[in-house]
Amino acid sequence: MSKEKSLVVDNIQSLEELISSVKEAQRIFSTYSQEQVDKIFTAAALAANKARIPLAKMAVKETGMGIVEDKVIKNHYAAEYIYNAYRDTKTCGVIEEDKAYGIKKIAEPIGVVAAVIPTTNPTSTAIFKTLISLKTRNGIIISPHPRAKESTIAAAKVVLEAAVAAGAPDGIIGWVDVPSLELTNTLMKEADIILATGGPGMVKAAYSSGKPALGVGAGNTPAIIDSTADVILAVNSIIHSKTFDNGMICASEQSVIVDSSVYKQVKEEFTKRGCHFLNKTELDKVRKTIIINGSLNAKIVGQSAYNIGKLSGIEVPETTKILIGEVTSVDLSEEFAHEKLSPVLAMYKAKDFDDAISKAERLIADGGFGHTSSIYINSATENYKLAKFEEAMKTCRILINTPSSQGGIGDLYNFKLAPSLTLGCGSWGGNSVSENVGVKHLINIKTVAERRENMLWFRAPEKVYFKKGCLPVALNEVKTVLGKKKAFIVTDQFLYKNGYTKCVTDKLDELGITHTTFFNVAPDPTLECAIEGTKAINSFEPDCIIAIGGGSAMDAAKIMWVMYEHPEVDFMDMAMRFMDIRKRIYTFPKMGEKAYFIAIPTSSGTGSEVTPFAVITDEKTGIKYPLADYELLPKMAIIDADMCMDQPKGLTAASGIDALTHALEAYASIMATDYTDGLALKAMKNIFEYLPAAYENGPHDAKAREQMATASTMAGMAFANAFLGVCHSMAHKLGAYHHIPHGIANALLITDVMRFNAAEVPAKMGTFSQYAYPHCKERYVECANFLGIAGKNDDEKFENFLKAIEELKDKVGIKKTIKDYGVDEKDFLATLDEMVENAFDDQCTGANPRYPLMSEIKAMYLKAYYGKEVNPEDIKTK
């Protein structure tokens, strides 16, 4: 016997001493290895198993309840089945590790467990709780029921002595020698966790103690016997369960609800197997005995049917197994509708399955929410009924064709149901757990998460064809490789009327491909336009869609493509923002099932031919919605400089700076990669070198046109994978509210945004695992170096880079401010706050290296309007 347990715990002072000593023992125990713990666990389980018979005898003698032979089984179960379930479970140190994902889970003990033990199962519950506490390196102090204190303490002593002999710290298990409500409440308040098994009052006290508690709820298990049930199996299973230890397991059946079609057969089988059906007089006598003043009569708990008969003043054979009362009411005014914890059973006749479920629901609601329910049924043929039963029962254990006493505690009739003598009842039963309590509930798990970088990607159309004059060669594949027969062309009126589509339609005619053209796409295409185009597509039923034009035509065509292939989609769902394109709530439908999508650009800026994006405007609200999903990627992109030769100067300038902004934002993005960086840098170099010539010489400089077409597509590929930033967010809203062309809007904002991003002490930086610290200025300097822009240091190089961009804008005729483009000051200021909020919420904002505050977006808008820093407070006073 340990030195500490020479202490007799019978008052608060001695309890405090015990708690202190167990805490010290647990502190030492918490340093033990898994190997040491498993040795102790094994020794304790062996000792408990060896003592199963004397402990059972002691429990029955002390409490006057139950059956020795059945308590032997319970003790055996508590030792052997609990040991077997957790013998290989890791409960110490690192219990799980995934080096690839950088996750490690470490188990730590909780501390000291306060274990409240019931009078119904004193020794087996003590064995169970001490064993799972030892397995988890916790100390445990047992508060026994006053009627079962000697046997409970004896069980704890057996486990303690074996554990200490195997190396456990002295005094790792303790107990209250003279239990009282005051001592139990004090123990619960000072322990680290409570394992409460007992009546509703005790469980409620545990949950009110202010400490984490694992308790059970009341059980009032109903068992339905369906018309399809194996009656012999059902009746004998219920008898086996209800008579086990005279019905003292809380999961035991309290009522049986029998379908009327088999009621007679069930009654005959119960009678044949030694059960007694009470007549009316006997029924009334037993009613008065089992429930007194609305509560269970403690004198009947764990008694035999014969002894309960004697208490009730009725005579039944001594061999009677169960007293069965045939009753009709499931209301609590009916004594037989209560939990009885004895071989007394209510029996109801159900007119049909729905009636049976209704009765079971009421019995559970009034006395057993969360605990256990049972059904006997042909599970192979009655799936519908089973599903209905499972849905209706608010219990955490639903047993099928199983004796509920043995089935509910687990690992006897189903080997995936964890063995336990503390059965959680979930929130329905006022519990914190809804499963059978085990070792996992007595450990704290520390999750160690190492920083990991996201898997990145590079996505592009499956076919990208480029070179001046490549269009007719690439289009051959539409017939020879793809086998397409009908092509629907989407373009705008200007391109259609000026013959830009003729080279495509002539080639389609040559290939024998039927075609039609929709040319009502306007700049900033609207939903109305997309719907109109979709009607034409539905009428034509093409197997190929060809978008010819700038971003507007390609964006409109992408939306039409989606509506054609998936008319069921909700546009607002598609436009929903996401933080990570792979984790978005809305999943885009699979595209390309009906039609193959080909994009042919006629301007050098948007890059839409190689991006998964489309911008569409709601004509009713004026709001622009940027859609993004890789399902929107064209299947084929054809970049033929011949299609871009005749761009007017204004379009050349706007689209050229748009492409530059794509490259700059892709390079600065928190999602930039080596794969996108090269494309972005080469695009920038092409634009700085060839945009002025393309602007000045137009169709007379084929090389400049081709290099700009290449730059646009490379920048498109870069931002298709690295995404954009707040410059585009702001430009989208500037275009929507004040109708400034998109490329011009970007041009007016880009250098202010770059200066904003380059701050080394930003208010907030972007969130992405790869983005380690604010280093956007370094990134911009890398661009400057690649472009050959010099400077004495990084700061000077950055400033010179900004100057070079401004000079490039000057060369292509772009004005300095928003105001210069005729936007009325009053109108601008009236819409400013709304633009700011919508820009902040734009899909592009999330990838910006500096996460913008709305006040910062507002300041950038004001600077872009006035061409100088402006105090927002001064604006308010205007």
Residue ranges with predicted function:
Residues 264, 272, 610-722:
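Carboxylate- and glycine-rich phosphate/diphosphate-binding segment that chelates Mg2+/Mn2+
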